[in-house]
Amino acid sequence: MLKIIFFLLFLIPFCFINNMYWMVQIMMFFISFIFLLMNNFMNYWSEISYFLGCDMLSYGLILLSLWICSLMLLASEMINKHNNYKNLFLLNIIILLLLLILTFSSMSLFMFYLFFESSLIPTLFLILGWGYQPERLQAGLYLLFYTLLVSLPMLIGIFYLMNKIGSMNFYLMNNFMFNYDLLYFCLLCAFLVKMPMFLVHLWLPKAHVEAPVSGSMILAGIMLKLGGYGMLRVISFLQLMNLKYSFVWISISLVGGVLVSLVCLRQTDLKALIAYSSVAHMGIVLSGLLTMTYWGLCGSYTLMIAHGLCSSGLFCLANVSYERLGSRSMLINKGLLNFMPSMTLWWFLLSSANMAAPPTLNLLGEIYLLNSIVSWSWISMILLSFLSFFSAAYTLYLYSFSQHGKLFSGVYSFSSGKIREYLLMLLHWLPLNLLILKSESFMLWL
């Protein structure tokens, strides 16, 4: 683990040399390929120092972080072109990536908490510094307060655990079982807001709409996964409480997923639609995770990875048309089949991935999750069928309204994409569809 972290630390001086933008990006791809070679399918924590280690769960998420951060630089070419504080932008992304890797490879619960909360700060800087509208101040405030309000109880819960056990190590804490309601709520609420669960999801659409494309990618790709990862880690010593209370979260998530899907069908803003669809997807991830079945845990992990790639790619596509047309509105982004014919293919591929068509990872994850939730309670079939149906409905709405129809009268030409954009789409889509061939690493990590 340490070699990856030092590699990133030594990339920081490169940010301040002129014309080094693409060099940094190539180096980040290089790091992700090195990390790919480090994979030895350990079922237990491997490469343990005192506080850094890696098992299959954190391995996949670290790889996703490296990949998405490399693609963020590929997507944010406008910052490089207009020289919009690009040195600080690179620095921000590298620090964010460093914090994310440390979060996912932390062995100690307290270290995890520390990095989990500090990864919020670079994200906030991304939204406030490179966002598009003045409302980004409000979005940043929402993001900050929703997340920080619930993280204090979590800290108190961690201190209580330290007092009782005398160790913060995840590996040792699995031997304990706590039958304490308040501790359960303290530890879980922080992750529920980060997921986000329906009812505490209001910060997400705001943050997504105001963020630049890189901010949206990192939010959709990794920030939403932090909650799921933390929950997978702490659920093992909160099993008794979870059996007692899980029905609350599962029902809120499933009903909320259906409601959010209905909200999606009324959106006019491309980015807001994709953001709300993320809430619906994370709702089903949360429900599957809290059933605490083998299928549920593996499926939530699979869908987290798949959703990270898929919705990140959709945000990139929305940004491509935003750069050309200067608007995110569905009233202006219509008839794009005439405007950018070759981008329509990517719109189609990523939209179909979003509604879990084969052979994407989304399909695999959703099959696992549907199985686990139905095995938990067969009544949830009703909500799940609605969820699946509306998921396809709003994805088709997004695709058909943006690609078909009459071209907006203010647009007088057509535009072809750049090779950079096609590469960006390919690098989102290829892992998403090829990883299904390696699905044992999504099932056998537990």
Swiss-Prot record:
Record key words, sorted: Electron transport, Membrane, Mitochondrion, NAD, Respiratory chain, Translocase, Transmembrane, Transmembrane helix, Transport, Ubiquinone
Example GO biological process: electron transport coupled proton transport
Kinase as UniProt keyword: no
EC number: 7.1.1.2
Localization, UniProt: Mitochondrion membrane
Residue spans crossing the bilayer: 4-24, 56-76, 93-113, 114-134, 139-159, 182-202, 218-238, 245-265, 272-292, 297-317, 330-350, 373-393, 426-446
Catalytic function, reaction form: a ubiquinone + NADH + 5 H(+)(in) = a ubiquinol + NAD(+) + 4 H(+)(out)
Gene Ontology CC terms, in alphabetical order: mitochondrial inner membrane; respiratory chain complex I
Gene Ontology MF term list: NADH dehydrogenase (ubiquinone) activity; ubiquinone binding
InterPro entries named among the record's database cross-references: NADH4_N, NADH_UbQ_OxRdtase, ND/Mrp_TM
Record's bilayer topology term: Multi-pass membrane protein
Family according to the record: Belongs to the complex I subunit 4 family.
Known function: Core subunit of the mitochondrial membrane respiratory chain NADH dehydrogenase (Complex I) that is believed to belong to the minimal assembly required for catalysis. Complex I functions in the transfer of electrons from NADH to the respiratory chain. The immediate electron acceptor for the enzyme is believed to be ubiquinone.
Protein name in UniProt: NADH-ubiquinone oxidoreductase chain 4
Species of the source: Drosophila melanogaster
Gene name of this polypeptide: mt:ND4
